Regions:
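A generic structural signal for solvent-exposed, polar alpha-helical segments
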Residues: 32, 77, 184-186, 203
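Flexible glycine/proline-rich, aromatic-decorated loop/lid segments
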Residues: 168-182
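A ubiquitous short alpha-helical element
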Residues: 118-124, 185-192
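Active-site neighborhood of glycoside hydrolase catalytic domains
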Residues: 189-211
């Protein structure tokens, strides 16, 4: 159940004394708050915080009723919110997401939707994850936990080596399993791929001293 509806089934002979439910979720509390003098905005903030919470169980997820897989693109959006909103217990799930991403890679390929059997490589999302703005860097900036950088350095280097450069020094695009950069149209894939690749390279280089 995800808060949308509750269906009870019982025979006619059953006498109902009380009906109810118990909410369950990841072991963390929402402690951050943002308030405005506009109740509509306050409601939006409350709903947004709850959305993050219900998307946290044994892993981060896109949404609990349609897509429970831990897609890295979703985690990259959720991770910064964790440090604004949740207590320190949520950092354990954040670290687990990084561990899953790094340790469940397929050879030199960093894939999304892990753990799980329906993993896929979306190069843009994997580059984002190991970039200066990705969820690994975000976690480190907020915790100072160098262990995740030790996990990440060699796999990140090997992943970046999967790309080749053209005569102009720009990366030659890789399709992976899904060449996805954004929804809708007029997405400048070449610019985005080079930008994410460069940022991932800078971030990886900055972590080399921890080898």
């Amino acid at each position: 159940l995800f808060g949308e509806q509750i269906i009870y089934s019982f025979s006619e002979s059953v006498k109902i004394l009380c009906l109810g439910y118990r909410s369950s979720g990841y072991d963390t509390d929402i402690i951050g708050s943002f308030t405005y003098d506009d109740e509509i905005l306050n409601t939006l903030v409350k709903k947004s915080a709850n959305t993050l919470y219900v998307c946290m169980r044994d892993n981060f997820m896109d949404c609990p009723d349609r897509e429970r897989g831990q897609w890295i693109g979703d985690v990259s959006v959720q991770m910064p919110q964790v440090f604004y909103l949740m207590d320190s217990n949520a950092q354990k799930l954040a670290k687990k997401a990084i561990s899953d991403f790094i340790h469940l890679r397929k050879g030199d390929v960093l894939v999304g939707n892990v753990p799980g059997v329906h993993f896929s490589e979306l190069p843009a999302q994997s580059l984002n994850a190991i970039s200066e703005m990705g969820f690994i860097a975000e976690y480190y900036r907020n915790t100072g936990d160098t262990e995740v950088l030790l996990w990440t350095f060699e796999p990140a280097v090997r992943y970046l080596m999967l790309w080749n450069l053209n005569d102009g020094g720009l990366v030659i695009g890789r399709n992976g399993n899904w060449r996805w950069f954004d929804h809708l149209y007029n997405v400048d894939e070449d610019v985005l791929e080079n930008a994410w690749y460069y940022s991932a390279k800078v971030c990886t280089k900055n972590g080399r001293h921890l080898r």
